[in-house]
């Protein structure tokens, strides 16, 4: 007999179809607890209460049998999800302890850290067939270590996007903290999911496509194989001080003010805190441009010359609709923007400057690339989003909606409030958060949730996935070394 509430199958939105049906986030939340066993009942009951009130989390992604288009997927009840062990499992790892993140102020420490780093990612993630379709929506594994708990969540990206994953962690914290008192809160969250999905579906059916706009039936040649797990990559976390990033942003904005004087002195835009969001750039834009430029430089191959490099930046569209979508909508509300760089533009990086210094040409190029990133993001507004949804609705094959990643992909989870969450008296707050790179994509960069280092100084942390030789070259890259504080391999826990 099924222990969970049943739900009616529902068709995934066109936003959801930007991702494959079996592509997962793996988020590892670490809790430092003196008696880890005491936390198991709290986590188990919270997870089961959450999926009980949000039953689509117990479901699976599969083909929509009555769809009039090709490639349409839906979330449906799963015959394999019948009891709590199919949703959340507990595993004991008594010989292992929580990872200790290197202190940025003491140099990279990469060699020492790497020497004790053990590849344990396969042991902590929930076990199921990641390549199967139908594909589970959500699974959890509670890993009990000698000095704490690592809760690993597997979340299907076709159902829940990055912002939604952060919201789901927030929901779980509330349920851990409030217990039975969270039921009404969960039911409100469930109602929000249903109403927002309907709203997005309705937008797609409203009105005709504007003249000259074609439906989304362009093929996505080879997009699927980019998302396949199992390839051997180096996954490092790069750490930058917030002060250095802000200083770099200031230099870029000064250059852009000279290049676009009319824009930088124009009337304030009420929708942004800067004068012109197309011309003045944020810290996030500058860091995105730095990663794009540096990775493009280290991956250039004279034997296989290419003319250009592209960067994909997924944009959270919740606040770009009018009216806005709810912050705690879990489903995909992402539009992937693209900017391009002619590789000939990188030639200026070899022309001047010394090791440890940023060249004039390098900063100028960085400013231009940050401006391109900002311009592509600024173009995402209510009107363009509604046209995008209508284009998708008119497409005859929804497999063509699958996003094709650029040469570099930079996603930002910095808005997550993970380190400010309270999971209740037993668990407390999160000691560490890692993104387990089981589904790593070469060239992917994920800006991690905002936090401070051990001294209380603000930092930016970015998980980067590259081939080992390119990762080494990136760490030695001239411009990167000017702002990189430290780096270390991704590690969730280690031998005690």
UniProtKB/Swiss-Prot annotation:
Skewed-composition ranges (Polar residues): 203-217
Biotechnological applications: Campesine G features good insecticidal activity against the global honeybee pest Galleria mellonella, which supports its future application in the development of biopesticides.
GO terms (BP aspect): alkaloid metabolic process
Record keyword Transferase present: yes
Region (Disordered): 203-228
Catalytic activity field: campesine A + acetyl-CoA = campesine C + CoA
Record key words, sorted: Acyltransferase, Alkaloid metabolism, Transferase
Record-listed E.C. numbers: 2.3.1.-
Key word Ligase present: no
UniProt-listed Pfam families: Transferase
MF annotations from Gene Ontology: acyltransferase activity
Pathway(s) served: Alkaloid biosynthesis
Top enzyme category: transferase
Family: Belongs to the fumigaclavine B O-acetyltransferase family.
Function description: O-acetyltransferase; part of the gene cluster that mediates the biosynthesis of campesine G, a dimeric indole piperazine alkaloid that shows good insecticidal activity Galleria mellonella. Within the pathway, cpsE acetylates N13 of campesine A to produce campesine C. CpsE produces an inseparable mixture of two acyl-atropisomers due to the spontaneous rotation of an acyl group at N13 of piperazine ring. The non-canonical non-ribosomal peptide synthetase cpsA catalyzes the first steps of the pathway by producing L-tryptophanal and L-valinal from their respective amino-acids.
Protein name, UniProt field: O-acetyltransferase cpsE
Species of origin: Aspergillus campestris (strain IBT 28561)
Gene name per UniProt: cpsE
């Amino acid at each position: 007999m099924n222990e969970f509430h049943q739900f009616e199958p529902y068709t995934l939105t066109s936003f959801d179809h930007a991702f494959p049906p079996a592509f997962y986030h793996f988020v590892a939340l670490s809790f430092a607890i003196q008696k880890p066993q005491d936390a198991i009942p709290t986590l188990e009951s919270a997870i089961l209460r959450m999926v009980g009130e949000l039953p689509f989390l117990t479901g699976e992604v599969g083909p929509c049998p009555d769809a009039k288009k090709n490639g349409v997927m839906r979330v449906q009840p799963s015959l394999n999800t019948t009891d709590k062990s199919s949703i959340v499992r507990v595993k004991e790892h008594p010989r292992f302890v929580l990872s200790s993140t290197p202190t940025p102020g003491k140099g990279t420490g990469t060699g020492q850290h790497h020497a004790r780093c053990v590849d344990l990612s396969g042991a902590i993630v929930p076990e199921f067939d990641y390549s199967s379709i139908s594909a589970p929506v959500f699974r959890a594994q509670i890993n009990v270590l000698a000095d704490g708990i690592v809760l690993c969540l597997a979340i299907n990206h076709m159902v829940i996007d990055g912002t939604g994953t952060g919201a789901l962690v927030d929901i779980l914290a509330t349920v851990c903290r409030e217990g039975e008192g969270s039921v009404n809160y969960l039911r409100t969250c469930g109602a929000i999911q249903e109403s927002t999905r309907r709203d997005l579906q309705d937008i797609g059916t409203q009105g005709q496509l504007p003249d000259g706009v074609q439906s989304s039936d362009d093929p996505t040649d080879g997009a699927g194989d980019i998302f396949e797990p199992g390839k051997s990559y180096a996954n490092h976390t790069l750490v930058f001080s917030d002060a250095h990033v802000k200083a770099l942003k200031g230099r870029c904005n000064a250059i852009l003010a000279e290049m676009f004087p009319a824009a930088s002195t124009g009337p304030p835009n009420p929708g942004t805190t800067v004068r012109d969001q197309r011309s003045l750039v944020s810290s996030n834009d500058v860091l995105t441009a730095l990663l794009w430029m540096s990775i493009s430089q280290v991956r250039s191959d004279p034997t296989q010359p290419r003319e250009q490099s592209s960067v994909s930046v997924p944009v959270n569209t919740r606040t770009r609709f009018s009216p806005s979508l709810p912050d705690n909508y879990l489903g995909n509300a992402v539009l992937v923007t693209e900017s391009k760089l002619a590789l000939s533009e990188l030639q200026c990086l070899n022309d001047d400057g010394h090791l440890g210094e940023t060249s004039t040409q390098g900063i100028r190029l960085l400013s231009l690339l940050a401006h391109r990133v900002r311009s592509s993001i600024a173009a995402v507004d209510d009107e363009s989003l509604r046209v995008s949804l209508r284009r998708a609705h008119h497409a005859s094959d929804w497999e063509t909606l699958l996003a094709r990643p650029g040469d570099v992909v930079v996603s930002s989870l910095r808005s997550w409030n993970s380190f400010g969450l309270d999971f209740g008296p037993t668990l407390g707050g999160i000691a560490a958060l890692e993104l387990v790179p089981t589904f790593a994509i070469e060239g992917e960069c994920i800006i991690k949730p905002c936090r401070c280092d051990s001294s209380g100084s603000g930092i930016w942390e970015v998980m980067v996935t590259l081939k080992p030789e390119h990762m080494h070259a990136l760490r030695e890259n001239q411009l990167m070394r000017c702002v990189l504080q430290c780096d270390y391999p991704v590690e969730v826990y280690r031998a005690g």
